[in-house]
């Protein structure tokens, strides 16, 4: 039996603020203290985004808290981190981001079954305010329908 997938952090606002076109999985190049801090669940991806720079995929503004037992060689919390994907995948993402005006944001950071740190990236398009209101109205309508069905079954 393998280990379970351990989700470190989740970007719940992303599904509210963006239309998600596609999702991808990428590895993260980390230092030792960053891995230890991630295992303790001390990360935040709320305002982070990914960008293709010089043919490499870089994750910006991801905050990993310094490791408590770390010494003076502890990592910088908000440093840019390299994401590990195949070159052809990076080129495809770069083309989509350039041509359609899409953005790459992380949805969640987790450790897979083999214990490797991974990030789930999403190719997204920003929602306008009226889109968000539409989603909220649809969710409320679904909730009302479910409530009415439950009431009908009780009688």
Curated annotation (Swiss-Prot):
Keyword DNA damage in annotation: no
GO molecular function terms noted in the UniProt entry: RNA binding
Keywords in alphabetical order: Cytoplasm, RNA-binding
Compartments reported by the entry: Cytoplasm
Domain of life: Bacteria
Keyword Signal: no
GO cellular component terms listed in the entry, alphabetical order: cytosol
SUPFAM superfamilies: Small protein B (SmpB)
Biological process annotations from GO: trans-translation
Protein family: Belongs to the SmpB family.
Function: Required for rescue of stalled ribosomes mediated by trans-translation. Binds to transfer-messenger RNA (tmRNA), required for stable association of tmRNA with ribosomes. tmRNA and SmpB together mimic tRNA shape, replacing the anticodon stem-loop with SmpB. tmRNA is encoded by the ssrA gene; the 2 termini fold to resemble tRNA(Ala) and it encodes a 'tag peptide', a short internal open reading frame. During trans-translation Ala-aminoacylated tmRNA acts like a tRNA, entering the A-site of stalled ribosomes, displacing the stalled mRNA.
HAMAP family noted in UniProt: SmpB
NCBIfam families, sorted: PRK05422.1 (NF003843), smpB (TIGR00086)
Name of the protein in question: SsrA-binding protein
Source species of the chain: Moorella thermoacetica (strain ATCC 39073 / JCM 9320)
Taxon lineage: Bacteria, Bacillati, Bacillota, Clostridia, Moorellales
Gene field: smpB
């Amino acid at each position: 039996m393998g280990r379970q997938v351990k989700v470190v952090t989740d970007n719940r606002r992303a599904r509210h603020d963006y239309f998600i076109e596609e999702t991808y999985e990428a590895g993260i190049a980390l230092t030792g203290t960053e891995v230890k801090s991630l295992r303790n669940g001390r990360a935040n991806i709320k305002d982070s985004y990914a960008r293709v720079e010089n043919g490499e995929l870089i994750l910006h503004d991801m905050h990993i808290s310094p490791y408590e037992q770390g010494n003076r060689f502890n990592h910088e919390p908000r440093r840019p981190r390299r994401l590990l994907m195949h070159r052809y995948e990076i080129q495809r993402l770069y083309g989509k981001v350039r041509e359609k005006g899409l953005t790459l944001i992380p949805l969640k950071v987790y450790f897979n079954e083999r214990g490797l740190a991974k990030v789930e990236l999403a190719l997204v398009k920003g929602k306008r305010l009226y889109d968000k209101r539409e989603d909220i109205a649809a969710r409320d309508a679904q909730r009302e329908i479910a409530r009415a069905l439950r009431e009908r079954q009780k009688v």
